Amino acid sequence: CIRDRAYVSQLPKTRHNGLGPGADLELGERLYEENCVDCHGAAGEGDVEKHIPAIAGQHYEYLMRQFENIRTGKRRNSDPEMVEQIQGFSPAQQAAVLDYTARLRPPEDKLAPYGWLNPDFPAYVRDAAGIRATPPAPPAQSE
C-alpha cells in the first residue's frame, strides 16, 4: 500500500483537473487560509516529511469524496487533527473550500506534459486533456 501511494504521488498531475461550480471562491479561500494552510501549505503543496499530501491540482469530486470519508471515519488512516478540524464544516463551506482547493495549481514541473496518457489506464480511458478516445470494439457475439 505504501509502495502504491509512493508510485501514485510521483505521477504527473493533470493540467485539466475537475473543478467545482465556482459559486463561492472567496469563502473557499478564506476557509482554506483559516483551516488548511498550516498543514497543506499556501499553494496546497503538502509536506512529504510529515506525510501531509499535496492537494493542489486534485479533482474537486475526489476532494469532496476524501473530505467526507475523513469526516465520517471511512478513511481509517486519517490524521486525527484533520478529522477534528473539519467536523464543523457545513455542506456549503465544504463545497466552497474544496472548489477553491481544486483550483490551486501545482508547480509546472509537477504537471503532465500536454497529451500525456497515464500508463496505468487503457488508451480509451480519459487522457490528461480530458479527451475520450474511441474504445475498442466489443467481441463479436456468437450465435
Segments the model singles out, each with a brief description of its role:
Residues 3-47, 60, 65-72, 76-143:
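Flexible coil segments in periplasmic/lumen-exposed cytochrome c-class electron-transfer proteins
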Residues 48-54:
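Short cysteine/histidine-rich zinc-coordinating motifs and their immediately flanking basic loops
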